[in-house]
């Protein structure tokens, strides 16, 4: 089966947009064109990804980064590495990947990703995950 993710709520942060990347394991793409930096918090509440309108950097020491399937095992001592020069970045976030539970009677599961800006404080992008068996 596959996990289908959807966004149910996006915070009202000027310049922020989020879309789900549909795939066998869903991902999320954020685009940010706001005036002040925006930080995505990781699964442990740590600073994970920083967005400005012209750059995206990731914290290679973040447990969320280390858990990504496509991250390199070799990291330098530098904590923040530039990943994009566009203000947009997509990744396979573990919060969008539920265990493949064939008992779908539980209904959709919820997910949330915290984002923070100096002006707005911490807010959440929230959504639902639904397991869909493939016949």
Task: Describe the predicted segments one by one.
Residues 1-135:
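N-terminal soluble domains immediately following signal/targeting peptides that reside
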